Curated annotation (Swiss-Prot):
Keyword Iron-sulfur included in the entry's annotation: no
Record's GO cellular component terms: cytosol; membrane
Organism listed in the record: Borreliella burgdorferi (strain ATCC 35210 / DSM 4680 / CIP 102532 / B31)
Species lineage: Bacteria, Pseudomonadati, Spirochaetota, Spirochaetia, Spirochaetales
Top-rank taxon: Bacteria
GO biological process entries: lipid A biosynthetic process
UniProt signal peptide: none
A GO term, aspect molecular function: acyl carrier activity
Gene name for this UniProt entry: acpP
Pathway recorded for this protein: Lipid metabolism; fatty acid biosynthesis
Post-translational modification: 4'-phosphopantetheine is transferred from CoA to a specific serine of apo-ACP by AcpS. This modification is essential for activity because fatty acids are bound in thioester linkage to the sulfhydryl of the prosthetic group.
Domain named Carrier: residues: 4-79
Official protein name in the record: Acyl carrier protein
Localization in the cell: Cytoplasm
Family annotation (NCBIfam families): acyl_carrier, PRK00982.1-2, PRK00982.1-4
């Protein structure tokens, strides 16, 4: 799975969960500042991402996610 495929899947999940248009979401989009996600939104997003990519996201790693690109890079590393 390459970065574009991962980003597309992540963007789709974020778009649906946060009710944002996909073209508003970039790898530089910040969850809180740009996408207006609150802590519950982020928790739900993490759950959906874990389900979609069949992988557990450790809490210490999740706390480091500021942008959509951070999530894409994390998943890319895990999926090799």
């Amino acid at each position: 799975m390459d970065n574009d495929e991962i980003f597309s899947k992540v963007r789709s999940i974020i778009s649906e969960q946060l009710d944002k248009k996909e073209d508003e979401i970039t790898t530089d989009s910040r969850f809180v500042e740009d996408l207006n996600a609150d802590s519950l939104d982020i928790y739900e997003l993490l759950y959906l991402l874990e389900e979609a990519f069949d992988d557990k996201i450790p809490e210490n790693e999740a706390n480091e996610f500021e942008t959509v690109g951070d999530v894409v890079n994390f998943i890319k590393k895990r999926k090799g």
